[in-house]
Amino acid sequence: WIKQDCLTIPAEHMKMKRLHRVPLTAYALSLLNEAKNTSKHKRSSYVFPGQKSSKHANSQILTNFMRQNSFFKNRLVPHGLRSIARSWMADHNVSYEVAEACLAHIVGSSVSRAYQRSDFFEARMQIHKQWDGFIQDCARSAQLTSPKADSIETPSLSQS
């Protein structure tokens, strides 16, 4: 699913049954690579295998983590992360169409969609790079990462 700087989610795995390409920054790739390398199941084809088997992790794992963690409990749910990102995009003057494309939302009438078929990948890559910087700043402020985290080289997680 990952090739170079793009994660392609097949249509059958998407809510709206449409293929979705996600731009990946160097930092995002490094986090995915770290997750894969720290897994108990290094031979699994999944970045996030389950704890007890090499099959994929339970889809509710993040929800369960947030419910059990005292910091997040009653403060944030996974879907709230999408809301935070969307609000950040609005505050940073990201166009409506590009912001909605970042969330894999379908916008416009069936007629307008017949003519506008771009997934705005290049524009979304620029947004992801800006969001990446925001996330790294937040992580540094919370002392969750080193000050040099943004000097990470692009890792070799991608499969050509």
Q: PLM features: what roles do these ranges have?
A:
Residues V22, S30, E34-S53, Q60-A101, ...:
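Short, basic (Lys/Arg/His-rich) helix/loop patches that form interaction surfaces
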Residues W1-C6, K73-R75, V94-Q116, D137-P147, ...:
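Short, polar N-cap/turn motifs at the start of nucleic acid-interacting alpha helices
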Residues K15, N37-T38, H105, R117, ...:
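A short linear boundary/processing microfeature
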Residues P10-K17, P49-K52, S118:
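Flexible interdomain linker/hinge and immediately adjacent N-terminus
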Residues I2, K15-K17, T25, H79-S83, ...:
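Active-site-proximal structural scaffolding
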Residues W1-E34, V107-S110:
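Conserved tyrosine-mediated DNA breakage-rejoining catalytic core shared by Y-recombinases
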Residues F121-G133, S141-S160:
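Acidic, low-complexity interaction regions
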